[in-house]
Amino acid sequence: MKLFFQTLLLTTSITLALTANANSEGEAMYSALGCVSCHGQGGKSTDENIPSLAGKDVEWIILQLEYFQSGERKNSLMNAMAPMAEGFERSIAEYLSSQSYKN
């Protein structure tokens, strides 16, 4: 029984560390790429014309980035910005999804 709890604790610790690392990379890329200047700190936009991304589904965020990257979804600013996120879509999406948002 003791071994079970030790294994459970170790597994939980590793999972939390990996999640924190992914969120940390996602947050760093979100800021470095300039996403924060429009979509706001933690994905909470203060401009009613720019969507907040905090708390959105990971797969939805990734799909939107891919649509902007391919040009399937049109927005001059996002069509220029989204390609810079290539390779970091999942970490950015996981970071944004982990942020809580209240209207």
PLM regions: where:
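Short pre-active-site segment immediately N-terminal to redox-active cysteine/selenocysteine motifs
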Residues: 31-34, 42, 57, 88
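The canonical Cys-X-X-Cys-His
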Residues: 34-41, 92, 96
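Axial heme c-ligation environment in periplasmic c-type cytochrome domains
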Residues: 46-54, 69-103
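Sec-dependent signal peptide recognition
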Residues: 2-10
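Electrostatic cytochrome c docking/interface patches
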Residues: 13-31, 41-49, 67, 100-101
